[in-house]
């Protein structure tokens, strides 16, 4: 198991990791406000706050994460909230291998892609594209340019040029927002034609 995966699993075993606020992302609330519910896939769902939020608003929500501790916490969070959401143990870069079946109307990745090594990023993008319905929204957020320490802990960043080149065959960039010094968020839309 890679060092970054060991560190993430250890963080969940020690309690709630610093990055887990337990609250849905405000941008997610804005993205789905006034929109008819559909199917949503949370890639790298962690403890499930976003999937639980979506399920509570009528969405059929599925979360996938490689950390068993995170999946267990997500299932508990859904049960405590009285909502039905599916949480699957698996690799976010290959959701179909974990039994996750699309198509989905909304995909989320809040803090997962920036930890995926370059060698697995093409597989991740292809997996996300394969799970997305034509016209689906994909909210991708994470660290744009990680400081040295974060790189040592497995953060690789999400640069605008990379998003255009890797995601471009499948998704259009509808919006990009820089948040603070290191964070970036992209609103991508799946092309109408199924590419790849």
Residue map of PLM features:
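A conserved beta-strand element that flanks and buttresses the S-adenosyl-L-methionine
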Residues: 108
């Amino acid at each position: 198991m890679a060092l970054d995966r060991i560190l993430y699993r250890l963080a969940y075993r020690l309690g709630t990791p610093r990055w887990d606020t337990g609250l849905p992302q405000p941008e997610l609330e804005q993205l789905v406000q006034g929109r008819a519910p559909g199917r949503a896939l949370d890639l790298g769902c962690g403890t499930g706050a976003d999937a639980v939020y979506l399920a509570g608003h009528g969405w059929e929500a599925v979360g996938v994460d490689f950390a068993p501790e995170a999946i267990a916490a997500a299932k508990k969070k859904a049960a405590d909230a009285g909502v039905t959401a599916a949480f699957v143990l698996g690799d976010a870069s290959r959701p179909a291998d974990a039994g996750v079946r699309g198509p989905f109307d909304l995909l989320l990745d809040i803090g997962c892609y920036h930890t995926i090594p370059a060698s697995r990023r093409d597989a991740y993008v292809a997996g996300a594209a394969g799970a997305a319905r034509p016209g689906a929204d994909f909210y991708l957020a994470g660290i744009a340019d990680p400081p040295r320490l974060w790189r040592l802990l497995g953060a690789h960043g999400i640069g605008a040029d990379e998003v255009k080149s890797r995601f471009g065959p499948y998704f259009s960039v509808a919006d990009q927002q820089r948040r603070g010094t290191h964070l970036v968020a992209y609103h991508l839309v799946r092309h109408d034609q199924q590419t790849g």
